[in-house]
C-alpha cells in the first residue's frame, strides 16, 4: 500500500512538471516511434570495461558503430546539439559550455537553474524535435540538453526542465507512459538523458571501479526501457538509438600548464579554463592580439594557441562571434589553468573537450528496431550525420544541416 501511494505521488509530481509545447497545431497520426537516449560521457570502449547485458541485447539484434566522433569542442552541450541538429557548433551556435556573446552582451553557461541554457536565442539550427513538430508530429523530451528551451518559436509537445532529483528509472517510466498514448497524442520522437557515467568519469577517472559501476547502473536503466517495451508487446516496433556526446580521458595534477607563467592575465578575461581557455581582449586591438599570440605560440609543447579565424580545419570553427580573440588548447590529458584557479583537492580525475582526433574523446552509437540492420557493427562516424539518419527513420524532411545522409545508410535496413 505504501509503495502504491509513493508511486501515485510521483506520478502526480511528474505530471505537474510535464510542460506542453508552445504552439497549437493539428497533429497527424504518428509514425514508428524513435527513442533517443544519451549516456553522457560513455566512451566508445566502455563496452569492454564491464558487463552491459541490456546494451548488448540491443547491439546483437541491432547495430553499433565502432565509435561516435564528436564535434570540436568535445563538450556536453555543443555535442548534444550537434547530434540533434546535424550541425557543427560553429553553425548551431553553442561553441562551448561557457561563452560570451558581444551582441547579446551576455554569458552562456550550463547547469541546473541556468536561464541562458533555457533561452533558444543562442541556438541557430533546428533540432530534431522542432523538425518533428513542424511536420505535425509530436516530440516529447525529458532532460535532453537544450530541449527545455523554446527554439525558433517551437517546443516539444511535452518537455521537462532539467531536475537531477528525478531518477533514471523515473525517466524511463515517463518515456513508457508517453509511448502508451493513443492516436495523434502519441509521440513519434522521444528523448532522454543520463549523466551518471560522465559524473563518475570526472570525479574518479575513466578506468575506475566507480565508473564501471555507473556503466552497469545505466545499463540496468536501459533494461527497464527494454522490458517495458516488451511488456507492451512493442519492443520490435520501436526504433531505439543510444548515443553519447563524447568520451573521457585521464587528468593528472602534474600535467597542468599555468597560463599566468607566460602572459600577464590581469587585463584579460578568461571565459573558461581547463581543457581550453578562450581569451577575450576588451578592445580587440590587433597589436595586443598579435603580442599575446607571439608570447603563447611556443610557450609549452602541450599547449597550442589559435586566433579567432586560425583554428585547424578539422575543428570547423570559423566565423562565430562567440569565438574569442585567442583560444589556448591543451593536448590530451593536460589542463590549462591559472595559479589561482588550481586546486589539487578539487581536481577532476577525468575530462573531455579535447580534439576529436583522440580516440579517448569518441562516444557510442547503438541502434535497434525496424529501421536498423540486425547484428551489424559499422565504422566510426561523426555525430553530425545522425540528424539526417533520424529524419530518414521517421520519414520527415530534414532542415538545413552539415550532415551527409549517405554516411549512415550502412546501418539502416535497405
Predicted regions and their residues:
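A long, amphipathic alpha-helix that forms part
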Residues: 169-180, 197-238, 290-291, 390
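His/Asp/Glu-rich, glycine-adjacent segments
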Residues: 87-88, 92-205
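Active-site neighborhoods of enzymes that stabilize oxyanions during catalysis
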Residues: 272-377, 381-389
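Short, structured active-site-proximal loop/turn typified by the sulfatase FGly-forming signature C/S-X-P-X-R
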Residues: 47-92
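C-terminal motif of bacterial Sec signal peptides marking the signal peptidase cleavage site
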Residues: 13-15
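Active-site-proximal N-terminal segment of extracellular/periplasmic enzymes that hydrolyze or transfer
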Residues: 19-64
